[in-house]
Curated annotation (Swiss-Prot):
Domain of life: Bacteria
Family: Belongs to the class-V pyridoxal-phosphate-dependent aminotransferase family. SerC subfamily.
Cofactor note: Binds 1 pyridoxal phosphate per subunit.
Top class in the EC scheme: transferase
One GO CC annotation: cytoplasm
Gene label: serC
Primary site of residence: cytoplasm
Protein name, UniProt field: Phosphoserine aminotransferase
Binding site for pyridoxal 5'-phosphate: 76-77, 102, 150, 169, 192, 234-235
Length: 356
């Protein structure tokens, strides 16, 4: 039986993507070769990379607007240092919003390159809310934020307006909701939350912001070099890029980001409504900052933990325990999560009510 996968990542992908990818593992494009063994320079894979890069920009509404899409390696953790390496001037500074664990990790890397101003932080309340009302220094080389926080279940609902370049880590909510993506100058997202398997990272960057900070950048960390090499400066993660393309095609076939967002809202509303209705549970995040991707919640009485755990496991649910730094539970309801699976969890929460 296929389980209801609530893992925060690597995470659920569409069933049809699994099916197409599994066929490609045996015979890709009737080539007689597996996708795992084809040359990354072959015309078949070059076509995959080109379409993936183009489709990413199309879905984000950024085609013809001076942006380039790249599929790189190293995850968002490498992007944490690539941003300052490519954008922070010598003796410059950057502004960061500290809204969670991954924002903190990005800040740590930025401090290696220059002054790093933390414009706002929710660390004082274990990151249960998104900081607001902060000021971004006009003389900063860029502003960095994390759109969604997988661990704490918070999500930025309104992004600040500023005249300096805006960098955003969208690893866990990329392609999940409509935004004016032209307000961002650099977006990066590890594939393993909402787009594909671990092994590749989508980078979307406005070309005009590159090459201005005067630094000598190592080749593998230089966005401009990756653009010039058409995302093939070194051997890319062929399979991860291919599966990401299949997922992007699935999003387009669904009706694009607008259609996906509508379903995501319905799933989140269904689950949060039960959390708020059921006296046995409480949400972990500030209500106005609740994530539509990672729903964090707690039992009001820890004595019910054993019973609840037995119920959701018996229902075929996987990956529900919360991160160790928060505890409780975390239901990751990414794009590919069907609303039927969310209903299963809601039914389990109601069943607990009748048992205690």
């Amino acid at each position: 039986m296929k389980k209801h996968n609530y893992s925060a990542g690597p995470s659920i992908l569409p069933q049809e993507v699994f099916e197409k990818a599994s066929k490609a593992v045996l015979n890709f494009n009737d080539s007689g070769l597996s996708i795992l063994e084809i040359s990354h320079r072959s015309k078949d894979f070059v076509a995959v990379m080109d379409e993936a890069r183009s489709l990413a920009l199309e879905l984000l509404g950024l085609q013809g607007k001076g942006y380039q899409a790249l599929f790189l390696q190293g995850g968002a953790s490498t992007a944490f240092l690539m941003a300052p390496y490519n954008l922070m001037k010598e003796n410059g500074k950057a502004a960061y919003l500290d809204s969670g664990t991954w924002a903190t990790a990005a800040i740590k890397e930025a401090k290696l390159f220059g002054e790093t101003v933390i414009v706002g932080s929710s660390k004082d309340d274990n990151y249960t809310y998104i900081p607001k009302g902060y000021e971004i220094p006009a003389d900063a080389d860029y502003f960095h934020c994390t759109s969604n926080n997988t661990i704490f279940g918070t999500q930025i609902q309104e992004f600040p307006s500023t005249n300096i370049p805006v960098v955003c880590d969208m690893s866990s909510d990329i392609f999940s909701r409509e935004l004016d993506f032209s307000k961002f100058d650099l977006i990066y997202a590890g594939a393993q939350k909402n787009m594909g398997p671990a092994g590749t990272t989508l980078v979307v960057v406005k070309e005009e912001i590159l090459g201005k900070n005067g630094r000598t950048i190592p080749s593998m960390l230089d966005y401009a070099k990756h653009i010039k090499a058409e995302s093939m400066y070194n051997t890319p993660s062929v399979f991860a890029v291919y599966v990401s393309l299949l997922t992007l095609q699935w999003i387009k076939a669904k009706g694009g980001i607008a259609a996906v967002e509508k379903l995501n809202n319905a799933k989140a509303d269904l689950l949060y409504a039960e959390i708020d209705r059921n006296p046995l549970f409480k949400g972990a995040a500030n209500v106005e900052d609740r994530s539509k991707m990672n729903v964090t919640f707690l039992l009001n009485n820890p004595e019910h933990t054993e019973t609840f755990d037995a119920l959701w496991k018996a229902a075929g649910i996987s990956g529900l325990p919360g991160h160790r730094s928060v505890g409780g539970y975390r239901a990751s309801i990414y794009n590919a999560m069907p609303i039927e699976s969310v209903q299963v969890l809601v039914d389990v929460m109601k069943a607990l009510e009748s048992k205690v």
